[in-house]
């Protein structure tokens, strides 16, 4: 009798193990199999462990499926919005060589090859009182800039471009408002000045890839931009010929700064690192272009802006309005 009782106990334990190791065709069957040894008085730990493992796996798969469904729903919603407004973003732009275009801030047809053959030595000799005021105003601004940045031309270029991008936007905005008020065209000068502002902004986006401004330099940018925007706005309202002359002299100083930048690059004082990808695409530079190539094309852009603003000032000095002379649209 005692041997039968011992055998029954052994069979119960063996049965618990067999119930756990038997393959279940569904999670419900597995759960039932895990529960039997516990009800029969056997060890329940293996069955519970298996149930928990399968439960965790099931939860993970459910969460993954839910995320996939949410992502799919968002994609469908975006497509619906684009289709509703008629603005399709699915078409990918490509370069001339067929590779994908990765920039959203400018398009392939907005790129160009800079004209580096432009005369960099041109200078407008100040003759009138307003010209002299404009000239010495710019010269006075150069002195504190030299002290603050010294030979750190990367950060100096960053500061310069945050200022240089303001006049074109202010002038274009005021001409735009004037065109609306007077119901007259601008002779293309609105577009020319806004192109200048955009070009200067792209200079800034480029140098932000190679310069690492400190927090106080960023704070200085905010201060200088705020002061200069309002000052130039008032100056343009009072005297457009004076405002354009100031920008012409600012661009002459920019040419000088970038020339010094190039000298330090050639002397090895500044590392001639590879050109940022955004610069290679924007100016259509070769794939192996360097920082020196970038500074060279930026300097050429500044020379073109110098010519445009001195030209605009000369138009006003001759007693004409800008609309009377066709604007040099796309003059790079």
UniProtKB/Swiss-Prot annotation:
Domain of life where this protein originates: Eukaryota
Record keywords: Disulfide bond, Electron transport, Iron, Membrane, Metal-binding, Mitochondrion, Mitochondrion inner membrane, Oxidoreductase, Respiratory chain, Transit peptide, Transmembrane, Transmembrane helix, Transport
GO biological process: alternative respiration
Chain residues that bind Fe cation 2: 200, 251, 302, 305
Co-factor: note: Binds 2 iron ions per subunit.
Induction of synthesis: Induced by cold. Induced by drought and salt stresses, heat shock, hydrogen peroxide and methyl viologen. Down-regulated under oxygen deprivation.
Reactions catalysed, as given in the entry: 2 a ubiquinol + O2 = 2 a ubiquinone + 2 H2O
Record's bilayer topology term: Multi-pass membrane protein
Predominant localisation class: mitochondrion
InterPro entries hit by this protein: AOX, AOX_sf
EC number: 1.10.3.11
Subcellular location: Mitochondrion inner membrane
Assembly, per entry: Homodimer; disulfide-linked.
Stated family: Belongs to the alternative oxidase family.
The protein's name in its UniProt record: Ubiquinol oxidase 1a, mitochondrial
Naturally occurring in which organism (per UniProt): Oryza sativa subsp. japonica (Rice)
Gene, per the UniProt record: AOX1A
